[in-house]
Amino acid sequence: MSSDKVKNGNEPEESEESCGDESASYTTNSTTSRSKSPSSSTRSKRRGRRSTKSKPKSRAAYKYDTHVKENHGANIFGVAFNTLLGKDEPQVFATAGSNRVTVYECPRQGGMQLLHCYADPDPDEVFYTCAWSYDLKTSSPLLAAAGYRGVIRVIDVEQNEAVGNYIGHGQAINELKFHPHKLQLLLSGSKDHAIRLWNIQSHVCIAILGGVEGHRDEVLSIDFNMRGDRIVSSGMDHSLKLWCLNTPEFHHKIELSNTFSQEKSTLPFPTVTKHFPDFSTRDIHRNYVDCVQWFGNFVLSKSCENAIVCWKPGQLHQSFEQVKPSDSSCTIIAEFEYDECEIWFVRFGFNPWQKVIALGNQQGKVYVWELDPSDPEGAHMTTLHNSRSVATVRQIAFSRDASVLVYVCDDATVWRWNRRQTTSI
């Protein structure tokens, strides 16, 4: 891959970055499409829902820096910053598209620098998602990636080789997330309607979430809360489900997985199956729910309806423990509206430390909301757009301090924007 960069300027030059592996190929077909949604009609207003009135701002919070194009020419579906690195360490992120996972550094002075590119041995693989962790013994950065083939690859970034391969899901994997504190725990959501919890240190599947009252269609998005004791999931069945891990059974299974040895044990690991979520609702969205993340005790979720919804289970005054599993009621806190994004598998970026959300649309534009913790409905919204950014924006990621915003597109481009120095987030 070349290291050509596009620098700041009013008339940016186009630049392509290649992986240097011409043997890897990509075939577009309907089975790997991430675009079609069941309805292209605009979202209808529903009773009790409050629209967020964004406060006007004089200029965009972020300024264009550079963009590159990966030479596979295919959709890039996923992007993730390594937020585990220290404040003084380089800002590193990875992209997932075609059968490749590409790692870049964002130098402080601007631009993008290629660090590594991993090409899956299966040329038919299409990666949809990636997530960062590190080896608990060596502290080497690890990158998990998965997609169309339903196989999770855990890659040692420095060695540029897979050190773990996890097979269990029957179909494609749509999202991966690592536990915020126990970084050997990896969560995966799949087209097979199930969520799995893995231990990448002992290479076992700890739990399967799904079944009797689980998702009825593809699981599209998953997330741990900041404490790591709850999971939220969403899917094609229009539902959002919450799963608690703070039970004696889960504590025991997680501890057991840390010491379990497949070589020494004559029996397989006793994977637990949780058929019943601790909360479930279909009252928030009327279409595929393709992105969900925790915001403290609130949940941010979106569908193909031109709005990100901030909500919580039960009534506003209720704690999660007071909400019964049989109660599907929920409270809408705020909505963040945008335009021209009515296809599925378009995922927003959220920086919980700096309270900023960003989402792209089908026209290559990006909406950025700077949240006011004292007034969730009074978010500042600005729009980012470069004349050369015209393809669907699939996912957005922020650096830990939110100084850099990166997004990836259907035309194989990767875009970097820098926070303006005068902007306070």
UniProtKB/Swiss-Prot annotation:
Biased region (Basic residues) positions are 43-60
Tell me any Pfam family this protein matches: WD40
- Where in this protein does the record put region Disordered? 1-64
Q: Which cellular component appears as one GO term in the record? A: ESC/E(Z) complex
What main location does UniProt list?
nucleus
Instruction: Note the InterPro entries from the entry.
Output: PcG_WD-repeat, WD40/YVTN_repeat-like_dom_sf, WD40_repeat_CS, WD40_repeat_dom_sf, WD40_rpt
> Which stretches does UniProt call biased (Low complexity)?
21-42
> Per the record, where are the segments of Acidic residues compositional bias?
11-20
SMART domains in the cross-refs: WD40
According to the UniProt entry, its GO molecular function terms are: enzyme activator activity; identical protein binding
This protein's source sits in the domain of life called: Eukaryota
Compositional bias, Basic and acidic residues, is annotated for 1-10
Residue windows of the WD repeats: 71-114, 126-165, 168-208, 214-253, 284-321, 340-379, 388-424
Q: In which tissues is it expressed?
A: Widely expressed.
| Assembly information from the UniProt record | Component of the polycomb repressive complex 2 (PRC2, also known as the Esc/E(Z) complex), composed of Caf1-55, esc, E(z), Su(z)12, and possibly pho. PRC2 associates with the accessory components Jarid2 and jing to form the PRC2 Jarid2-jing variant (PRC2.2). PRC2 may also associate with Pcl and HDAC1/Rpd3 during early embryogenesis. This complex is distinct from the PRC1 complex, which contains many other PcG proteins like Pc, Ph, Psc, Su(z)2. The two complexes however cooperate and interact together during the first 3 hours of development to establish PcG silencing.
Q: What is this protein called?
A: Polycomb protein esc
